[in-house]
A protein has these predicted regions:
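Short beta-strand/loop element within the Bergerat-fold HATPase_c
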Residues: 83-95
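Short beta-to-alpha transition helix within the HATPase_c
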Residues: 6-10, 22-39
Length: 160
């Protein structure tokens, strides 16, 4: 993950930066992922209220946000450009980090345990990693397929 993080930082130094939050780690991850989404004509909306510093490990933040936003981008790409959207809501409250990622998708039922990626070695690792991060922070994660919308909600506890 360290190599990936340095690559992201390098890309952002050469490109446009948006300030989503004063938390440098989260802001760096979001800039990287949202620039990719915007290049793919995906409308992005955010509502983020997190402190400048918190004890969420940067590699955990990268795995959690990276996998969820990559999955949302991948689902949106299967739709015509005008129907592509994703939203991220993050709220820090009373030592909890509450996160919701929603995105448009085709109407096909999603099986989160089954990857559509061609690389079978990494199949299902993304959602498994998200579950592991939630468990590490004594939290929960839920995946909801609502037809043309997919939503992931995660709550992490003990975040200071």
């Amino acid at each position: 993950f360290h190599t990936e993080f340095r690559k992201i930082l390098g890309e952002l130094e050469n490109g446009e930066k948006t300030i989503y939050t004063s938390n440098v780690i989260i802001n760096t991850i979001l800039n990287s992922k949202f620039h990719v989404a915007e290049r793919k004509k995906i409308k992005v909306s955010t509502s983020i209220l997190v402190p400048k510093e918190m004890n969420l490990d940067y590699s955990d933040a990268g795995i959690l946000l990276g996998n969820l936003l990559d999955n949302a981008t991948e689902a949106c790409e299967k739709l015509p450009a005008g129907k592509r959207w994703m939203s991220l809501n993050m709220l820090y409250k009373e030592h909890m980090l509450i996160l919701k990622v929603s995105n448009s998708k085709d109407g096909k039922k999603v099986d989160i345990n089954k990857s559509r990626k061609r690389n079978l070695v990494s199949s299902g690792i993304g959602t498994h990693s998200v579950k592991c991060i939630a468990e590490k922070y004594n939290g929960t994660v839920s995946f909801m397929d609502m037809g043309e919308t997919f939503e992931v909600c995660a709550v992490l506890y003990g975040i200071f």
